[in-house]
Structures are given as C-alpha cells and as structure tokens.
C-alpha cells in the first residue's frame, strides 16, 4: 500500500475507572484472547501497510510488552516494520504529548523519513475490520485533502462522546463538532483518517508554530471549510472503548454469532500475540452456556453469557453470569458473580458474592493479586 500507518495509543479516559490503572486503553483485553490495539494493527497488516508507528504514553508497560515482537502482525521485515514511540526528553522538548497533533509533531522525523505518499492515522481503542486501501481509493477519487472514516450509529448510543459530522450529497464534510453537548447528527467520526504525508507535515508544523496540540480541534474543525474533507462511510461493525460501559458492551457483542463470525471466520483474520497454553478444561459438574472460554482456563462451576480470558479458574459450585473475567483470575468455591468485570490476577475468595446490574456494571478489584495460576 502507498501509505504508512500511525496508531495513536497513548490516551486515557476517567470513564474507564480502575480498569486503566494497570494498562492503557489500547491494551485492554477483548474477546477472550485479544487486545484492543490488535484490530488496528491487523487492519494495517491486512491492508499491506509495511511501515507502522505506535505512539504510546499513558501506562504503557503492558502495551509495550504486548508489542515486543512484531512478528504476530507480520511486521518483522527488513524494510519497514513496527515502531513504538514514547515521549522523549530532548534539547527542545521536555513534555509528554499534550495532544494528538503534538504527538505527531514530536515524532515528525518518522513522517519526514518515510517515502510513502499517504498516511493512515487510527486509534488503538476501536474494534473494527477495514481495508484501508478502499479508503485510500475513495480519498484519491474525491481529490480530498483529508478523508475521515465515519459511521451512522443508533439512537441508543451516547452521541455526545463522539465527534459528529454533517455530510453533503457528495460525501463532503460540511460541519464537524467534537463531542457536542447535544446530538445534532447520527453520523460520527471513527477516528480514522487518510491524508497526504506532505500535507500532514505542513499542517502539524503550522499547529506547532501556533501552539495548537489537538488533531481534531486544531485541524479537522479548524479547516473544515478551507480543506476538502470527505467522509468514507463504514457499514460494518465498529465500537470504541472509552468507558466501563462501552468496554463491557463491546466484549458482550462477541457472544453474538454474527459479530464473532465477522471477526474470526470471515477473511481477513485478526492477529494477536500467541501464548502457548493448553485448551480450556471443563471438569465434571461444569456447565457452560453462550460463553467464550479462553485457553488455559479451568471451569468447575456454571458460566453463562460470560467471557473468561486466559488462565481463569472457576471453582466448584460457582455461578458466573453476564460477566467478564480477565486473565489469571482465581475464583474460589461457592462464589456468585453477576454483571461484573473482574480485574486480571485477582483472587476471589470462596463463598463471596458480587452482583452488579445491566445499568451499573460492577468492577471487582481485589487486593489479593495472583502472579501464577
């Protein structure tokens, strides 16, 4: 593909509550065996983008560990590859990334030293499948300065947490509002952009000269009437992880056959770092209904409408319903967990009950951390 890829993976959200204490949002576990960033990385690999940079910042240890080998996404190559950039103290800079535009500016050498004519920018906190080649073809066809991947979402979604766009009959974005107080459109930005590399360098340098730091507010919103900004409409599944509720809903979506088949049975594949673990084990007395049970897990009790991540242990006479159990969790006998997210490496003592509601998902974080199964 005639583009380099940039994944913005340094952000945090207070709405994630305690779940982001251990990891960046881009490293949040998804669908039993994946991380949020795997979807953007897989899309870039499947689109034949050979030169990809990941910008990390907040709580990046877990994310850096996940990205320690690029071979899982087929970026282990002599030319190009996967690069991870963190904020660096230099003679001219001693700040963290102050915004998305500032992150691009602090890594401007990556853009200047590349030779591909286009750049694909994506977030590491979104779950979707997309061939970026189709977006680039649309971008060239429309002679656009910037192309924004957009999607119509349902009335049940909280529109105010997204950037909302207004599109004319030709597909051009005529108005862009970043997280307005009230919904004025049913079409949102998916946080995926295609732009010519030289133009991006010019815009980023202009932002830096004027001490502007945000890509959306200081480029998309500011230049919406001065640049040809077009919308590419995404028709397939897309989800953004930005809160406990959205994280829970995204994982629960993978219990739906149509979502699961779209990601894991339809070409192309989604890739992730692989752990050499035995298959899940179901002991006598185990009952499992409509659940994803990941490798290395052991189930002795009842699990319904839930997701167990790697190396989870469910004791005798336990009942787990409508819950997400993260990696390396030990759940003692006679425990009831409903409508909860249990943090990784927690030890849940026997004869314990944790019950949330569909409207208020309970995040369970115990002080008794386990480090081996």
Residues covered by each model-derived region:
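Unchanged
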Residues: 1-254, 364-366
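Left-handed beta-helix
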Residues: 1-4, 198, 206-373
